Amino acid sequence: FACTANAQTGITVTGRVTDDAGNAIERATVTMTRLDDGTKLAPVITGNDGTFMIDSISEGRYTLGITCVGYDKYNKKLRVSGPLDLGAVVMGGSAKMLDEVTVMADYSSVKSNGTITVRVKGNPLAKGLTLLDFMKFMRGVSVRGEDVSVYGRQNTLIYLEEQEITQEQMKTIDPSMISHIDVITNPDASYGLGIGGVIKIYLRDDGGVLGTLTFNGRVSQDGLLRALPGLNLLYARGKVRVSNLLTGSLHDKSVRSQVQNDVADNVETQTETNSVTRGNGYLMDNLALRYSPTDLDRIYVYGGVRMSNGETSTNSHDGTDFLNINSLSKPRYYSAGLQYKHFFRKDSVSYFFFRGSYSGQDYSEGLSYVLNSTADNARLGYNTNDVWIDPVLHMVLNKKSNLNAGLVYGYMYDKHDDTGTTQFGYIRDGRYVSSGTDYGAWVDYSTKIGKFLYVQGTLNYHGTKSVFRDRIDSKNNVDLWEDGIYPSIFAQWNLSKEENPSPAKEFYINFNYQYYYSLPNYNYTLPTVTWQGQNQYSIGNPDLTKENHHDFYVWLAYHRKWTVYYDFNYGDNLVKVIMHADPDRKDTYFTRPENAGWQIQHKLSVAYQTKVFDFWYTNTEMIVRNRRESMPGKSVSQTSLYFSTSNNFKIAKNYGITLDFAASTKTKTLSYEYDGWFNLNAQAYMSLLKNKLNVNLSYNGVFYNRPKMTVYGDGWMLTRKYLSHNTSVSLNVSWNFSIGKKIKDNRDMPSIGSAGRAIPTF
């Protein structure tokens, strides 16, 4: 059951709230009011299966009231003389609410721990939109291009219920399959340290077989860029549940063009580079199985695989020399995991949770370099194995207080075997092994003080052992041990003076301080050389160490329209990608990550969400950021402005258009300067055949500019301007279907994510 009100004595009233079709209605508010004196019992919220329970009720006559956005209000008079099970309570759909653009706040709520829950099922704003487009209208979520984050913070994680997935996998899930989404603004230590936020997607609980067929295509002036079909399935019967996410590629291509001007010793050189990457087909599949041997136990087994073949061709010339780089790669990713969850009692929410996961990667890449008429070859390869184990204990101490504790162990082993070029010296031979071991322990305590103040404190210990072994030159070996204790505290105060305020009365403020570390991207620590063109390459740095951050933020939600967010961050030993002139190659530059100095950043965000007219809903945000960075011999201080607005115009019940505009002023960092930019996207969408068929046609880059990046060095300056076509047309089509009996209790369905590697370049 979702929630229990009052003391655990007296008469109990239970029931299950459904719609006309028998589907469970979750997060409906249930109230009971005595007819003789008007006394109201504390409201409860229905769970994922639509059930509710109200206890400690005395005998008498009551009015049962149920409300939920998108449905007509339900009222019924009851006589209570003993335990009462109402069975299915049916709510009718509200035609008025579903025919107009509804304020997203009506479909969202804020929990005492700061988590924002957005109901997707039945939400009019979800009709015809992709999940990524729908998220543009969610409070607390920032969508920039195809990247999703919580309040624009780094290190945002995406979960499909209890298992982390990639943003690529998230985009394959159609909103029609989703029950609700939790935006966790204050993730506890079980998600890791230094996590900016968590977006947690919960699937619907109806349909013996619930599925979606999808197709995503994109074309531009460069031809067909993308043709991606997908199939998502969720099936349950008895104690067994199976989910499967399957995505493939018929065609995948990206084109990138740039012009670069280098000025050194008053001599200017211009280089043009064109790069075309083709995915010669890929297949990604994630399968998850859940078995419930008893009402108290959940066992999950899951696995995934991603196989692809890629080809990249890069041409670069400076008027004198012509360089062609061809790459053929075959990456393979695979993963598996086991989870076990045990509830201590049938009516308890206390539990023990164990998670063990394994992931591996096999990668091989053949490289061909042709400089003018001379050819040379290289080959790169690595094998990576990664294991994580983390048990968690969640204890409900009383109605107001919780205690969580957990342990973390992780081990990674990465073996590289690179054969370098023999004539040009572009790639060195590499025989090295990198390994790492993580140890952690954490505990957090949360409590509610009075009715309106929630406080949570966390203490986290983490240690990391990093080992790098160069099999060719032992002078490059690195042994590193880093550890620390990292505290955090969070508080949320409900200023509306109602325990469950309506969206129109919401008034929350929360505070958070945390001291955390941030490890560099793993690929940054590898000495692998990657050439981006004739006169630029990148190389990793095995000597990198962790960053340290102190972060404090204040979040204010006023009524349904306004959200104000302020964040202060101080970080030292920061990892920055720095560009250098190659002393051995004229007019050649390389980027390398380095622990370089410190940063103080202030960020103020003001977001406004409202229904301007019955047909127009807008979500607009303005961010002002002041950042000061400093390293020996150089410092940068700058204030920048970012603006974005997403607008949904409802033309008819199942048709509409959206317009998205974003812009930023010039930004400066220790690494580079980047000109201001702007971009406008438009799309038309429709939902047909009782929302089973959704079609979305997007025109990306209606108008935009091409900003310039500038890097300054000792006696040299480099400018780069991208010339790629940003205008494209995308088509997204999804067909939703369901077969069989209803699925109940759709908790904790896992899926598979995969680790990502970043190249240390701009």
Where are these regions (language model features)?
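Short, acidic, small-residue-rich periplasmic hinge/interaction motif at the N-terminus
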Residues: 18, 29-33, 65-71, 81-124, ...
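Outer-membrane beta-barrel translocator/receptor signature
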Residues: 192-199, 207-256, 280-283
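Short acidic/polar hinge/loop motifs at secondary-structure boundaries
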Residues: 163-188, 285
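Face-selective signature of the C-terminal outer-membrane beta-barrel domain
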Residues: 282-309, 327-473, 482-488, 492-510, ...
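Extracytoplasmic beta-strand/coil segments of soluble accessory domains associated
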Residues: 132-164, 202
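N-terminal periplasmic accessory domains that precede
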Residues: 85-90, 100, 104-106, 131-134, ...
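Outer-membrane beta-barrel signature, preferentially recognizing the C-terminal barrel domain
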Residues: 434, 517-572, 590-602, 724-725
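Short, acidic Ser/Thr/Gly-rich low-complexity loop/linker segments typical of extracellular
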Residues: 36-51
